[in-house]
Amino acid sequence: MNFKYIVAVSFLIASAYARSEENDEQSLSQRDVLEEESLREIRGIGTKILGGVKTALKGALKELASTYANGKRTAEEHEVMKRLEVVMRDLDSLDYPEEASERETRDFNQEEIANLYTKKEKRLLGPVLGLVSNALGGLLKNIG
C-alpha cells in the first residue's frame, strides 16, 4: 500500500513539475515575443526620427549652400561652402551606403577603409553642428 501511494504522489509531483516547466517556457516565449515587438517599435521610431533629422539637416544645409552660392564669397565663406559640400556628400552616403562604399573602396585596402569609416563617424556630427552654428551666426550678422 505504501509503495502505490509513493508512486502516485511521485507521478503527481512529476506531472505538476512538467506543467510548471511548460508554463514557464510559454511565458518566457511570450515575453521574448513582446520584447522583440517593443524593440522593433523602438527601432522604427528611432529610424523615423533619424530620417526626419537627416531630412531637416539636409534641407538646412541646402538652404545655407544656396545662400552662400548666390552672393560673393570671402575666403572664409568659400571654405565653409567646401565643408558644407563634404557634409552633404557624407549625408548622401548615409542614404546610399552601397554606392558610397564602392566609391571609397576602389583605391583603399581594408585597414584604410576601417580607419576611413571610423573617422567619418567621428567627423560627421561635430563639423555639421559647427558649420550650422557658424553659418547661422554669419546669417544673423548679415541680417542684423
From Swiss-Prot:
Keywords: Amidation, Amphibian defense peptide, Antibiotic, Antimicrobial, Cleavage on pair of basic residues, Cytolysis, Fungicide, Hemolysis, Secreted, Signal. Expressed by the skin glands. This is Maximins 1/H12. The modification Isoleucine amide is found at I143. Maximin-1 shows antibacterial activity against both Gram-positive and Gram-negative bacteria. It also shows antimicrobial activity against the fungus C.albicans, but not against A.flavus nor P.uticale. It has little hemolytic activity. It possess a significant cytotoxicity against tumor cell lines. It does not possess a significant anti-HIV activity. It shows high spermicidal activity. The keyword Secreted applies. The lineage of its organism: Eukaryota, Metazoa, Chordata, Craniata, Vertebrata. Belongs to the bombinin family. It comes from Bombina maxima (Giant fire-bellied toad). It is found in: Secreted. Residues 19-43, 74-123 form a propeptide. One of its GO terms (cellular component) is extracellular region. InterPro entries: Bombinin. GO terms for biological process: defense response to bacterium; defense response to fungus; killing of cells of another organism. Its main location: secreted. The keyword Secreted applies. The modification Asparagine amide is found at N70. Residues 1-18 form the signal peptide.
